[in-house]
């Protein structure tokens, strides 16, 4: 995905306000051996790009002053109550170095699972993304989570995800294998089932 930006000459709070009034958003590119680079982007184009999941999870081709570099979106600052992007951070990517980032989770086939079909359970998505490590060339746009075999009362964990080649989960001390989805039967459904099984007097 290509992103066009321009070198930012003006700095400071007043300059940022003037840029916003002109329909621009400030940003910075950092990482690698090059010095951090201050940039500005067209606000409307950026606003629409940020609505796309791939913009947050893919390697982006950022063009500044005719020079292209591969980057990852690392941070976005929004206005507290206006539909306004205040600032964005991009990190340069080295094709030979592994990167840590978060991949979105796409949940599939819950409607055909035993939990839903046999037990009328509700499948909850406990996590919407997960931290991974891989080379830039191996970075997946998203990870699929197959829920077709989940049963009532069961949970799926991070290590249940089928990872593409070259992609590894980043383990954390406090949650090495976190729950990403669970299937629970609503209390009302359990009560109704119990009443249906009560033998007649």
Swiss-Prot record:
One GO cellular component assignment for this chain's record is: cytosolic large ribosomal subunit
Show the GO MF annotations. 5S rRNA binding; structural constituent of ribosome
Q: Which UniProt keywords apply?
A: Ribonucleoprotein, Ribosomal protein, RNA-binding, rRNA-binding
GO BP: translation
InterPro entries xrefs: Rbsml_bL25/Gln-tRNA_synth_N, Ribosomal_bL25/Gln-tRNA_synth, Ribosomal_bL25_b-dom, Ribosomal_bL25_C, Ribosomal_bL25_long, Ribosomal_L25_dom, Ribosomal_uL5_bac-type
| Subunit annotation | Part of the 50S ribosomal subunit; part of the 5S rRNA/L5/L18/L25 subcomplex. Contacts the 5S rRNA. Binds to the 5S rRNA independently of L5 and L18.
What is the role of the protein in this entry? This is one of the proteins that binds to the 5S RNA in the ribosome where it forms part of the central protuberance.
The family this protein is said to belong to: Belongs to the bacterial ribosomal protein bL25 family. CTC subfamily.
Q: What is this protein called?
A: Large ribosomal subunit protein bL25
Organism lineage reads as: Bacteria, Pseudomonadati, Pseudomonadota, Betaproteobacteria, Burkholderiales
């Amino acid at each position: 995905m290509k992103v066009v930006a321009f070198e930012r000459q003006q700095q400071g709070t007043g300059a940022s306000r003037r840029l916003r009034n002109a329909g621009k958003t400030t940003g910075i590119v950092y990482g690698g051996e090059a010095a951090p680079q201050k940039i500005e982007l067209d606000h409307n184009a950026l606003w629409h790009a940020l609505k796309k999941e791939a913009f947050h999870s893919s390697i982006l081709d950022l063009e500044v002053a005719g020079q292209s570099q591969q980057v990852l979106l690392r941070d976005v600052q929004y206005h507290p109550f206006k539909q306004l992007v205040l600032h964005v951070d991009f990190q340069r990517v080295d094709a030979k170095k592994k990167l840590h980032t978060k991949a979105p989770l796409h949940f599939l086939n819950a409607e055909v699972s035993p939990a839903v079909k046999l037990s009328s359970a509700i499948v909850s998505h406990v996590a919407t993304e997960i931290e991974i490590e891989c080379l830039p060339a191996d970075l997946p746009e998203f990870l699929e989570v197959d829920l077709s075999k989940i049963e009532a009362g069961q949970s799926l964990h991070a290590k249940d995800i089928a990872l593409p080649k070259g992609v590894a989960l980043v383990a954390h001390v406090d949650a090495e294998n976190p729950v990403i989805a669970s299937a629970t039967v609503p209390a009302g459904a359990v009560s109704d089932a119990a009443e249906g099984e009560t033998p007649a007097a």
